[in-house]
Amino acid sequence: MCSSDLVDLDTSTNDTLIIMASGLAGNPEITEENADYDAFVAALTAIAEHMCAEHAGDGEGATHLITCEVTHAPDLKTARAVSRSVVCSNLFKAAVFGRDANWGRILCAIGYTPGDFSIDKVCVWLSSKAGEVYVCENAAYHPYSEDEAAKVLAEHDILVKVDMGTGDASAKAWGCDLTYDYVKINGDYRT
């Protein structure tokens, strides 16, 4: 899922991706029955995910790109809603900016997400190229080093891994942190 509101829950009229085919090249049409279909879908998905991540990481004043990968959700709708809820949580976005591994804010965002799942089975990891910390096991604190967590959260690209523990569905969403500069940029903006 990618939409421009993953930066601040407001949709911009300027962010659009349009894919068109005129047929003028004379290539055979790609349909679900065509052997090229799976390769086309995989390539298009990779491009769309890359553009979505680039867009989210380029939010006003952003210093971190946040990716949330949800696994073992009961269904795709819930997996998508949970991943989006985490990256859109202003409290969690501010925690990332402050390099605070505040797993309670992640759990809060998951908890207010509509869906039929057991919050008691949720496990959460925070990772980046600096390492990984396991911060929440079965909706409770999992011991971790604050110093290690701060190192993980000092990197630009932050991955939040959420294991719902209830099914086979998965989804991914992207967002960015919430910074002082975001407020300044948008507070100073005049139309």
Language-model features, listed with the residues they occupy:
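Short, small-residue-biased leader/transition segments that mark boundaries at the very start
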Residues: 1-3
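Active-site-proximal loop/short-helix segments
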Residues: 14-22
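Short gly/pro-enriched beta-turn/loop segments at secondary-structure junctions
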Residues: 12-15, 61-65, 119
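Internal helix-turn-beta structural module
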Residues: 81, 88-191
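Active-site-adjacent loop/helix surface patches within enzyme catalytic domains
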Residues: 6
